[in-house]
Each structure stands twice: as C-alpha cells, then as structure tokens.
Amino acid sequence: MTASTIKALSAQLAAKEVSAEELARHYLSRIEAGAHLNAFTHVDAEATLAQARAADARIAAGNAAPLTGVPIAHKDVFVTRGWRATAGSKMLGNYVSPFDATVVERLGAAGMVTLGKTNMDEFAMGSSNENSAFGAVKNPWNLEHVPGGSSGGSAAAVAADLAPAATGTDTGGSIRQPASFSGITGIKPTYGRVSRYGMIAFASSLDQGGPMARTAEDCALLLSAMAGFDPRDSTSLEPGRGGDVEDFGRLLGQPLQGADAARPLAGLRIGLPKEYFGEGLADDVRTTVRAALAELEKLGATLVDISLPKTELSIPTYYVIAPAEASSNLSRFDGVRYGHRAAEYRDLADMYRKSRAEGFGWEVKRRILVGAYVLSHGYYDAYYLQAQKIRRIIAQDFQNVLAGANRQCDVIMGPVAPTVAWKLGEKTSDPVQMYLADIFTLSTSLAGLPGMSVPAGFGANGLPVGLQIIGNYFEEARMLQIAHAFQQATDWHHRQPAA
C-alpha cells in the first residue's frame, strides 16, 4: 500500500490487489496520524467507507471507470451533500450542504471516494493558510513553515500522502502557489473550463477549480473528469467554445509533433519573462528554476527571452477587482438565511453588524472594506473601471507573445513564487508582503489563462520549489504533456517529506 499516484492505485484496484474499502481505511488512518498538520476541517469515516463499499460493488459488477475507488479530498470551498462546507470560516462553521458542487458530483460519478474536507484560508482569501477559522495548516516538509494558500490543506494532504489527490481553487494563485510550496503538481485550467456551481464564491470572474496531485498524469485524469460545460454555471464555457468533454491526458508520453522519444520537446519554444527573473526573485528559487529549464533544454526545448511589461500592475489590479467582487458575494452572509448569527442583539441592524463582525476574520473584513470602497459612488470610475481596463491590457500582454503572426513562444515558464515557503507568522502582520508573494501568478488569473506548478527541486531549508507553466487558452493538454515529459526525466515529484 505504498503507491500514492492515482494511476498506480487504479491499477491495483483493477487487478483486485486491494479493495476500495481497504484503500479508504488506509488513508483515513493516515489522516488521523497526520492530524498535527491540520490539513482537514472535517472527516466522516462512515460516509467515506459507505462510498468505498459502493465503489467495490461497481468494480465487482464490471462497471468501473479509471477513477472508481480512488480516494480524494475536497477543498472545503466545494459544497458536498451531507457534509459540512465551511469555506474555512466561522460564518459557515455549522453549514451542512443539501447538494453537491458540480466538481464533487462529477468526481463522485467517476467513482471517487471522498476522504474529507481540507482546510483553507477563509473564503479562499490568503496565501499561507493562516487565515482559517480552524487554525493554520503546517507544511509537511517543515512544520514551522506555511504550506501556501488558499488551498493549503489540499496541498499538505497530498504532499504528506494523507490523500492521493485533492481538489483546489485558484483565484490569484491558490492552486499553483501551495503546490509549489508543498512539492506537488497542481493545475489551474482556463477560466470557465471547470464549473463553479457549488463552489463558495470569492471573486466570481477569477475563481477556478482544478486538481492537485503528485504527478501531471494524475492531474490529467482528474481534470478530464472535472471539466466540461455545466448549464448551472453562467460562466461555464459552452461546447465548441472550450466546454467540451476532453481527454487531457491524450498527449501524455507522446513527443511533440516533429520530435522523437530522445528529445520529446524538440521544437518547443519556452518564453522566459524578464519580469519573472528580476531582483525580487530569491537566489535559491532562481537557481532551482534555471536548473529545471536546463533540463527542459536537454529534452529539446528552446529558451526565448520575452517581456510581460504590465506584470507589476497585476497586484494593484487584482486587489481592486477581487475585493470588489468579494464584497458583493459575501453580502449574502447576514445571519438571516444561513451562516453565523449573533446570540445577542438589539435590533435587525445590530444583528447584521454583530453576526458579520463575529463570523468573518480580519483578512476577510479587510477585503470587504476595500471592495465596498472601490465600488462606492465617486470611486467606482477611478478604481474599479480603471482596474478592469488594466486587466484587459495585462491579458493582451500574454497574447502578444503567445498568439498571432508575431508569436514569440509556445508556452511561458518561470517561478511560481519569489521565495520558498516562509515561516508561520512571518508575514501575518504585513498583508502587503503577503500579497507580493503572488506577483508571478496573479496576471495569469486576471487573463483567465491556464497555469500549473510542477515540482522542480528544493531551495533554502530543504523546502520545495515549483516551476510554473503558462499556456494560451485551452492548451491544458499540451501543458500537461510538457509537464509529464519533464517528470519522466526528473524525480522531484516522487520526493516525499520525512515521516
């Protein structure tokens, strides 16, 4: 029971070397043993084992799919029928969902077994998983450091082998950054590829769900099950426009067109933005990423210097748009319809004030205030509309190098974050420093492009470093193909933290 990749577990289940119930019990015991990481907010062993037994019956009847019986953990932002769905907040501490999110529904239809709900920054607002009402998550590689956020619980669970895979969400880097900090693989698809129905909203024009696992191959299997048009999500891409059901693993193991097995990436042009390799990049991260790029050159790729000149504007742009959308989305949590309600209050207005004051944490309150300010009369044009204009310019930066007659490269690569994971508590007193940690991921989210992180080595204090791969719209299959080729030539994705 040492295998921890989805592909290996699926093969064991198909060969009847192990049952789904045995797998579920194995991972439930690992979750219990790894409780010190605080990666999970909720586990329901009986519900998990019931799903596992149903998967075993499906396998016995010959109706199994490739994912049937494989366990998975869900970020606690995806509602799951009969399970608590807290979004890491006291505001939703006792909320039990009557329905499944589309992501949960589709993975369940594929036969996957839910292990539990993973910890996260409150309402996905954070880069360290220290903003959770249920306490901070610890990085399995060094318990004094953060795992990244906001999908830190999912990243820590996969890294520590408490789960072979997990779901995450990425608004400004919340799949890629924790994947990098925790030494696993994670992909944020093109905006609209994965349904947001049943995903508790932070910033609706940015939020996107995606898979987190040990390998690119596993992420491809998961994304194939998760993605596709959903009429219940108004932002879901329609069939023929990116919303088709797709086999994202179809190119894995194949050399690029015109290449061969010895040099599978021959002809690939990798763009290196000069803005991603400037003075703000830590030396250990720079060295590790450069070594990974050298490995890709050995596989036949060519490195090309490019520029994304509006990168520096991504932080102020994001921190106008995202809080504005958050202030609107979170207005529904008033203590009346659902969510935390204050025990004592004078009147209705006092109940609203006290319920929200008690239910929301400081970072969420900060972003609600910022969002309400930039949407207010007199400031809407000056801030929000200007930010939306800059957002379009940032998106055009990417198209200038990835598309058109003057296309300079096929994919873009660089670091995921400027540093390795920092120590718990190191940046909580200075939110701006925390925000700067997302400088290399925010622009991709603002543009709606797919991006992923793959393990690329280790930096200071033996902490993982991720290599970021950014593609043009709908190019996830090629990104996964490239990531898989890199992982076939390296073993960073197989490294695990000490028990």
Curated annotation (Swiss-Prot):
Cysteine pairings via disulfide bonds: none
EC top class named in words: ligase
Keywords per UniProt: ATP-binding, Ligase, Nucleotide-binding, Protein biosynthesis
Catalytic activity: L-glutamyl-tRNA(Gln) + L-glutamine + ATP + H2O = L-glutaminyl-tRNA(Gln) + L-glutamate + ADP + phosphate + H(+)
Pfam families: Amidase
EC number: 6.3.5.7
Listed InterPro entries: Amidase, Amidase_CS, Amidase_dom, AS_sf, GatA
GO biological process, one term: translation
GO molecular function: ATP binding; glutaminyl-tRNA synthase (glutamine-hydrolyzing) activity
Annotated catalytic residues: K75 (charge relay system), S150 (charge relay system), S174 (acyl-ester intermediate)
GO cellular component: glutamyl-tRNA(Gln) amidotransferase complex
NCBIfam families: gatA
General function of this protein: Allows the formation of correctly charged Gln-tRNA(Gln) through the transamidation of misacylated Glu-tRNA(Gln) in organisms which lack glutaminyl-tRNA synthetase. The reaction takes place in the presence of glutamine and ATP through an activated gamma-phospho-Glu-tRNA(Gln).
HAMAP family associated with the record: GatA (MF_00120)
Subunit structure: Heterotrimer of A, B and C subunits.
Family: Belongs to the amidase family. GatA subfamily.
Full protein name: Glutamyl-tRNA(Gln) amidotransferase subunit A
Source species of the chain: Ralstonia pickettii (strain 12J)
Recorded name of the encoding gene: gatA
